[in-house]
């Protein structure tokens, strides 16, 4: 029996190179090994302030980007999280079994809480969705009873909570729940900011020169890579502690050379990047990186332009139908265990 994987991608803004290398690039490998359920996490996107028209456009652009990756949608079930009410229904059941203390201890909640703007009376309004976010994530996962869950390093604590909740519910309600294995792509999980290589690449970073977006122009990409922080060693090597900027550029280039569109560049450089750049300058490295980034992003743009609204709707509808079959079965199991629904009153 084929094993199952689940992963969600949040459509809270423009997608950047960190999203591509950290999550999207690994999807092709996942689809060859697992039955993959892939969802656009639009319910998670509304846990913070949002604009409906922009959210809808972000959803569409993310779906088109995912379609442009060339995944086999006979193997991959792509859908919108909000299209399946089972996510929120199980989310509420799990919420009743969580406690305030464990949710308030979540590092991401603490960080986002501090980032909230102060009101005119110097108080802070904290959206409840920030607090309950990891419980919905637990429901997203448990709903499909997956064997593995690809994760980012910043989500590890949430996934530990998922396991804690699953064990708690399983023991209390005598449920047989599969505890998934969480896997992390350590090579590309933390693509760092080009301007500040000590920070993860993120659309929330103040200096946007360090973030390469998947819709950036060729000129913008070249400009951002040229300005990328390096050092005064003039030595190209993997040395994260002493040369974080150069190391980040090498990590990004290594990942991008795996893409088919960079076949010729990969052939030129070879498998040993440090050896190839031994007698070359930082500018040489940046020029090659610019070419590699442009090749990937321009290819994605071209493929996205070929995707019609009909293609989007068909893939999402097919994915939703397949996901619903699994989600329905799991939710029925939880409802029965919790003693819910009228047809159980006289059992």
From Swiss-Prot:
SUPFAM superfamilies, sorted: Nucleotidylyl transferase
Main location group: cytoplasm
E.C. number(s) listed in UniProt: 6.1.1.2
Catalysed reactions listed for this entry: tRNA(Trp) + L-tryptophan + ATP = L-tryptophyl-tRNA(Trp) + AMP + diphosphate + H(+)
Residues the entry annotates as binding ATP: 10-12, 18-19, 152-154, 191, 200-204
EC class: ligase
Subcellular location: Cytoplasm
Residues where L-tryptophan binds: 140
UniProt GO molecular function: ATP binding; tryptophan-tRNA ligase activity
UniProt record, GO biological process: tryptophanyl-tRNA aminoacylation
Oligomeric and partner information: Homodimer.
PANTHER family reported in the protein's UniProt record: TRYPTOPHAN--TRNA LIGASE, MITOCHONDRIAL
NCBIfam families with a match to the protein in the record: trpS
UniProt protein name: Tryptophan--tRNA ligase
């Amino acid at each position: 029996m084929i094993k199952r994987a689940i992963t969600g991608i949040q459509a809270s803004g423009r997608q950047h190179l960190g999203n591509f290398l950290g999550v999207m690039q690994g999807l092709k490998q996942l689809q060859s090994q697992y039955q993959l359920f892939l969802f656009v996490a639009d319910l998670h996107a509304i846990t913070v302030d949002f604009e409906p028209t922009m959210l809808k456009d972000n959803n569409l652009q993310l779906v088109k980007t995912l379609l442009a990756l060339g995944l086999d949608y006979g193997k991959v079930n792509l859908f919108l999280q909000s299209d399946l009410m089972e996510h929120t229904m199980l989310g509420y059941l799990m919420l009743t079994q969580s406690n305030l203390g464990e949710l308030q201890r979540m590092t991401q909640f603490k960080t986002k809480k501090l980032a909230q703007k102060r009101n005119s009376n110097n108080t802070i309004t904290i959206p409840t969705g920030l607090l309950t976010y990891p419980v919905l994530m637990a429901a997203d996962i448990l709903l499909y009873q997956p064997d593995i869950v690809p994760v980012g390093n910043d989500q590890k604590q949430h996934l530990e909570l998922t396991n804690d909740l699953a064990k708690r519910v399983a023991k209390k309600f005598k449920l047989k729940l599969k505890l998934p294995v969480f896997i992390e792509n350590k090579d590309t999980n933390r693509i760092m900011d080009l301007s500040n290589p000590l920070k993860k690449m993120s659309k929330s970073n103040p200096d946007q020169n360090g973030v390469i977006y998947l819709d950036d122009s060729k000129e913008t990409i070249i400009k951002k890579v040229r300005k990328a922080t390096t050092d005064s060693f003039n030595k190209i090597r993997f040395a994260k502690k002493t040369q974080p900027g150069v190391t980040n550029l090498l990590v990004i280039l290594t990942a991008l050379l795996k893409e088919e569109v960079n076949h010729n560049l990969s052939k030129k450089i070879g498998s040993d990047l440090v050896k190839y750049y031994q007698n070359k300058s930082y500018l040489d490295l940046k020029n090659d990186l610019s070419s590699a980034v442009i090749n990937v992003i321009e290819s994605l743009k071209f493929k996205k332009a070929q995707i019609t609204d009909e293609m989007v709707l068909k893939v999402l509808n097919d994915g939703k139908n397949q996901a619903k079959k699994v989600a329905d079965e799991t939710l029925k199991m939880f409802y029965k265990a919790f003693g819910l629904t009228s047809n159980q009153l006289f059992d």
